[in-house]
């Protein structure tokens, strides 16, 4: 993702996140999800809620894509990815992308375990764990959605939303995510 190109979308979502009825809209849109998915969706912070809702509006013509839009960022674990770490990632992506790649590679080497959730827990709390969560939030979301009993096609779309799209639905999801 090119953060400079995406800046207008980020500003729009930042403004949407301030809307006093954001939570009410999230509750209404969350009715399309199963109970476990809804619980995951409602744990998103205000910015991620606004981002997911804006994506869902863009993709609302397809029920599967709408659900994927609502759930694609549930892997951005609120207690692991704080605002400081998010801003640090964005700053490094814009101004020092080589340093960001280097830091991510170092964190990647230190993560141990079988599954993605075990690998997160193997890292010390703080920016390292936050960087790992930011880099792997699609896979994390996929693991959480599997536990929630989500349909495999939904899990695949969410899990792979940071990767090169392999079909039309994945392309549309990625395009909406990159625009906002």
What positions do the PLM features span?
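Divalent metal-dependent catalytic cores for phosphoryl transfer on phosphate-bearing substrates
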Residues: 42-180
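Non-catalytic interface/linker regions that flank or bridge core catalytic/transmembrane domains
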Residues: 1-40, 160-165, 178-180
